[in-house]
Amino acid sequence: MVREEVAVSTRTLQWKCVESRTDSKRLSYGRFILSPLMKGQADMIGIAMRRALLGEIEGTCITRAKSDKIPHEYSTIVGIEESVHQILMNLKEIVLRSNLYGTCDASIFVRGPRCVTAQDIISPPSVKMVDTTQHIASLTEPIDLCIGLQIERDRGYRMKTPNNDQDGSYPIPIEAVSMPVRNANHSIHSYGNGNEKQEILFLEIWTNGSLTPKEALHEASHNLIDLFIPFLHGEEEDINLEDSLNRGTLPFFTFQDKLANLRKNKKAIALECIFIDQSELPPRTYNCLKRSNIHTLLDLLSNSQEDLMRIEHLRIEDVKRILDILQKHFTIDLPKNKF
């Protein structure tokens, strides 16, 4: 467990992790502070961060299971202690950590008698089991258990939606709960007198082990920033709200629009304020960059072409696409290597 004393800054806004501990493989805790804040700001930030932590962070989970021996969810299989429904509930609880984009396939192939755990799941290298001891089923007889699984990265809660495969079979859907953050709370400490009264925001985060509390805080912060980016340049647009409302939708400010407006008004482009997920990069490319801590244009320009080629899962055509975008919108060429 890591614990630090709380030192309140009287000048610039700062945040710090004051406590960090791992209670188990599937439970991590972190306590953070942000200060100094003006009266009312701590509650505003705390509420927004809590909602972003609980609802805006992506998680990875098993969403479907398929086996020739399983006719439907409420059946039983001779030689297996648990019912099919219990096995599905156990699969639902498996905690996964991944840099996956979209879906992938996994499988279980075991022969009894033995206990089946998360360690028996055969998955791509991009998917890791957080706790390999998580129980799935108990085989009491020398039978084969073969289950095909679908793993998906998403956010929030998804109801079961039955759907047949191309081969005509019917995989059993699993209610997916893609929520890495188990709980989040905030509290406020006020100090000072009169007009000089200030606040400290305390933020507590519990995760399921697929993310550390610090990683969850970082991702939630970026998700909130992304939501507010269109408003940063809203005053530069001549928007007829009445016409827009009659059409039923408001104008969408694209990456190209914002750059054009900045150039038109002769404003310096704040590279650190332009996030790569606002560009026209494909989601898979964006996720590769994000996993390498490249979140803004400034982060991207700190790398050479060779650096990008070394990023895991980033293909040469992805690098060419990035270079084309930099040249097209910024007339910038990344150096081939760092000197």
Swiss-Prot record:
NCBIfam families hit by this protein: rpoA
Segments carrying the region annotation (Alpha C-terminal domain (alpha-CTD)) are: 267-339
Give the span(s) annotated as Alpha N-terminal domain (alpha-NTD): 1-235
Gene Ontology CC annotation, any one: mitochondrion
Keyword Signal attributed: no
Phylogenetic classification of the source organism: Eukaryota, Viridiplantae, Streptophyta, Embryophyta, Tracheophyta
Q: Which gene encodes it?
A: rpoA
Q: Where in the cell is it found?
A: Plastid, Chloroplast
Q: What protein name is recorded for this chain? A: DNA-directed RNA polymerase subunit alpha
Q: What does this protein do?
A: DNA-dependent RNA polymerase catalyzes the transcription of DNA into RNA using the four ribonucleoside triphosphates as substrates.
Where does this protein come from, organism-wise? Drimys granadensis
What's noted about domains in the record? The N-terminal domain is essential for RNAP assembly and basal transcription, whereas the C-terminal domain is involved in interaction with transcriptional regulators and with upstream promoter elements.
Q: Name one GO molecular function term.
A: protein dimerization activity
UniProt keywords (A-Z) are:
Chloroplast, DNA-directed RNA polymerase, Nucleotidyltransferase, Plastid, Transcription, Transferase
The protein's assembly and partners: In plastids the minimal PEP RNA polymerase catalytic core is composed of four subunits: alpha, beta, beta', and beta''. When a (nuclear-encoded) sigma factor is associated with the core the holoenzyme is formed, which can initiate transcription.
Q: Which family does it belong to?
A: Belongs to the RNA polymerase alpha chain family.
Reactions catalysed according to its record: RNA(n) + a ribonucleoside 5'-triphosphate = RNA(n+1) + diphosphate
Report the EC code(s) recorded for this entry. 2.7.7.6
Q: Matching CDD domains, A to Z?
A: RNAP_alpha_NTD
Q: What is its main location?
A: plastid
Per its UniProt record, what InterPro entries does this chain match? DNA-dir_RNA_pol_insert (IPR011262), DNA-dir_RNA_pol_RpoA/D/Rpb3 (IPR011263), DNA-dir_RpoA (IPR011773), RBP11-like (IPR036603), RNAP_asu_C (IPR011260), RNApol_insert_sf (IPR036643)
The UniProt entry, under Pfam families, shows: RNA_pol_A_bac, RNA_pol_A_CTD, RNA_pol_L
The organism sits in which domain of life? Eukaryota
Q: Which GO terms describe its biological process?
A: DNA-templated transcription
